[in-house]
Amino acid sequence: MEDFVRQCFNPMIVELAEKAMKEYGEDPKIETNKFAAICTHLEVCFMYSDFHFIDERGESTIIESGDPNALLKHRFEIIEGRDRTMAWTVVNSICNTTGVEKPKFLPDLYDYKENRFIEIGVTRREVHTYYLEKANKIKSEKTHIHIFSFTGEEMATKADYTLDEESRARIKTRLFTIRQEMASRGLWDSFRQSERGEETVEERFEITGTMCRLADQSLPPNFSSLEKFRAYVDGFEPNGCIEGKLSQMSKEVNARIEPFLKTTPRPLRLPDGPPCSQRSKFLLMDALKLSIEDPSHEGEGIPLYDAIKCMKTFFGWKEPNIVKPHEKGINPNYLLAWKQVLAELQDIENEEKIPKTKNMRKTSQLKWALGENMAPEKVDFEDCKDVSDLRQYDSDEPKPRSLASWIQSEFNKACELTDSSWIELDEIGEDVAPIEHIASMRRNYFTAEVSHCRATEYIMKGVYINTALLNASCAAMDDFQLIPMISKCRTKEGRRKTNLYGFLIKGRSHLRNDTDVVNFVSMEFSLTDPRLEPHRWEKYCVLRIGDMLLRTEIGQVSRPMFLYVRTNGTSKIKMKWGMEMRRCPFQSLQQIESMIEAESSVKEKDMTKEFFENKSETWPIGESPKGVEEGSIGKVCRTLLAKSVFNSLYASPQLEGFSAESRKLLLIVQALRDNLEPGTFDLGGLYEAIEECLINDPWVLLNASWFNSFLTHALR
């Protein structure tokens, strides 16, 4: 049978069928009848779609070989044969564009003329039997069903056969030929008997033993068993008066629904206290790069070689001294650590062959900075379980901090354009279907808007640092490895450029669990004088390490160069997410895409080109105390990207809590704006849940202040 399938069907169909079977863990060499059935079904779907187009007047037309320049659109979108993720993407896109109800199961085709999804069936049994099985499985009146059999019979929903006689005859003839070919090889009987009915997943699976007891224990009050709870839930009518439903749920609940009016919400209370401080793993707007253009030195691409080459571009090194000490740290150790880096880099250069990695000597200053031997000794629980006053450390609650202006400046800077490109346009191959062409066009427009954005630089920097640190943590667990902080970009003229921001030194890293911490010391170049905002840099010890000549309109000026040094830590799971910062553009691209989809459905055509090329139109970007801020579509793309990047850079439990809880209040306010007359109960409890996340995190405090601006303008 396998040989027959490979001879009988087009190689592309065979390849798609193999892929589909592998996706479900099935082997085409073993389940040969299933292999043949999938190939047959795919071929019928393709034949159904072949030669059917919609012309410029919106009429359905059949063209077998005509003018390639005619403005024709394929009448059918083929969904069958794509991998599941792509297939659902196509289905979602069609539903968003056309407003058709989303099907529960993946259909096979979409008919742009009749505006409906089609489920194609090919059966070796009675068409009526198979039709009923399909209809029972799909349970949707919106999806059109069309069944063919190998005996030339067919059946379709409401006897509406969609295609003309001739097109259907072609399909029936092909099925009859396949049957004859199989019969002549003695394969038909086995194939005919192997067809199973439509398989539907049984939704109720039995819970037994411990899980059953746990389920019975974890029910809401007044329910004695899971079965009774299930019966109650199945019979629960969701529409109707909320208060009645609540009282029906439990004797404990007596919620009073209060109307939510324009005057109801109050602003969020932001904490008082000293201004919040910088807590990102690396400097953002204040970072300074030492760069080389068109790098072609020996060992180019090896981080240590690149770093040494970048260091040689700067000639203003001076004897370092401390200009802003760290409040709690032993500051001379930070100074000695930098001197040690300079000395050991010098040692490398004196060697004949520069090594690929550099492990620092374990000096007392580095041991102190990396917390070596500082962890309390671990004792086996068996040895101390009898200690009467055994308890956990008392940990101090975080002290509240107030919102500082620097975090808004930091965000504004992330939305700006730089003079370099930080991402290349992907080479993804030719587009085949119309939907792929639209997707590529959107991606290219979006990439053009964000490739020069500073937030994109932060993505590449974050990915590089986290990847290098995770690699070193696994490969050199006991070593204090020196890791250069590097990024690569292209100048306006298209020349390659390698940048050095500074160095990290990794501490001991025996990371068994995802949350085990590896300490590191970061040393980063900057031209920002820390004394202007000392509260912002409280976790840093800042050294002055030299003077840099800068070209300005008035000629060359000399500016002091600083080194921001701090002890920091991260974990395997944080590094894993840091390495995946390239996902940020996807999130913002999806948000832009939903804006385009909304516009397209109003205009009933794809608006991608107009959306990006109409430079005169402005779009809402966000709220500020001044009102709704507006900007070009490029600015919207960059702002959305910067938000996504900052969510990654400043990820924290406070942000998780604030995002989840404030969203509830946001939805209530949106309902009020849409005149849906929302009602609430325990609004005070919701405010409490939001405000307990407003402690000291700069990004959360900024988001809360934006939320307050939104409340003010939304409820005018």
From Swiss-Prot:
EC number(s) per entry: 3.1.-.-
GO molecular function: endonuclease activity; metal ion binding; RNA binding
Pfam families assigned: Flu_PA
Residues binding Mn(2+) 1: 41, 108, 119-120
PTM annotation: Phosphorylated on serines and threonines by host kinases, including human casein kinase II.
Alphabetically ordered keywords of this record: Cap snatching, Endonuclease, Eukaryotic host gene expression shutoff by virus, Eukaryotic host transcription shutoff by virus, Host cytoplasm, Host gene expression shutoff by virus, Host nucleus, Host-virus interaction, Hydrolase, Inhibition of host RNA polymerase II by virus, Manganese, Metal-binding, Nuclease, Phosphoprotein
Leader sequence residues: none
Family in the record: Belongs to the influenza viruses PA family.
Job of this protein: Plays an essential role in viral RNA transcription and replication by forming the heterotrimeric polymerase complex together with PB1 and PB2 subunits. The complex transcribes viral mRNAs by using a unique mechanism called cap-snatching. It consists in the hijacking and cleavage of host capped pre-mRNAs. These short capped RNAs are then used as primers for viral mRNAs. The PB2 subunit is responsible for the binding of the 5' cap of cellular pre-mRNAs which are subsequently cleaved after 10-13 nucleotides by the PA subunit that carries the endonuclease activity.
The protein's name in its UniProt record: Polymerase acidic protein
Organism of provenance: Influenza A virus (strain A/Goose/Guangdong/1/1996 H5N1 genotype Gs/Gd)
